[in-house]
Amino acid sequence: VIGQNLAISLLSSALKKKHIAPGYIFQGPHGVGRSLTARRFLEGLVNNGMPTIRERNRIKRLNHPDLIWIEPTYINQGRLIPQSAAEKESIQKRTPPQIRLEQIRDIKTFLSKQPLETDMGMVVIEAVETMKEGASNALLKTLEEPGKGILILISSRPESLLPTIRSRCQEIPFS
């Protein structure tokens, strides 16, 4: 990722030292490579930093069994519709999409299970600042006891997160 030397340096150092925090906040404006960096960082956690082409592709396509990638959702006819799918299907809603309590509960369930192919469960939450209070409190509990897992929170407005969430994560600045 071009122009993100500090973020890349901090994450590379963590991988080299094998000192992985249970939570990270990738913070910075939209379009600067936070999601791409999250994928690359997760690749560094797989197979001792030597992921196979198959493993890389599964992370890229977000279909690795030890990875959950959460994005804000709409509720449409009782179903959660990810923001990206709603945009493709031209579903328009009156309320903005958000990270919902059900999604955070799914993370807790996911992290309580033994990873299938890696050393830890991997969770990425995009636009984490869209959470409401209930979801924020549930995420805080998950961060307090992540088990064998890593959470990467991607935010363009980290100041809107609960201070206790921020204090439990290593902040990675993007500019």
Language model features with spans:
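Conserved Walker B
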Residues: 127-131, 146, 158
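A short helix-turn-beta junction within AAA+ P-loop NTPase domains corresponding to the substrate/partner-engaging
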Residues: 163-175
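Conserved beta-strand segments of the P-loop GTPase G domain that flank and frequently precede/overlap
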Residues: 124-127, 152-154, 173-174
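Short, glycine/polar-rich helix-capping loops at beta-to-alpha or helix-loop-helix junctions
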Residues: 156-162
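Conserved adenine-binding aromatic site and its adjacent loop/helix in ATP-hydrolyzing domains
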Residues: 109, 141, 167
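Clamp-loader machinery-focused feature within the broader ASCE/P-loop NTPase space
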Residues: 1-134
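Conserved catalytic/switch belt of AAA+ P-loop NTPases
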Residues: 112-113, 137-153
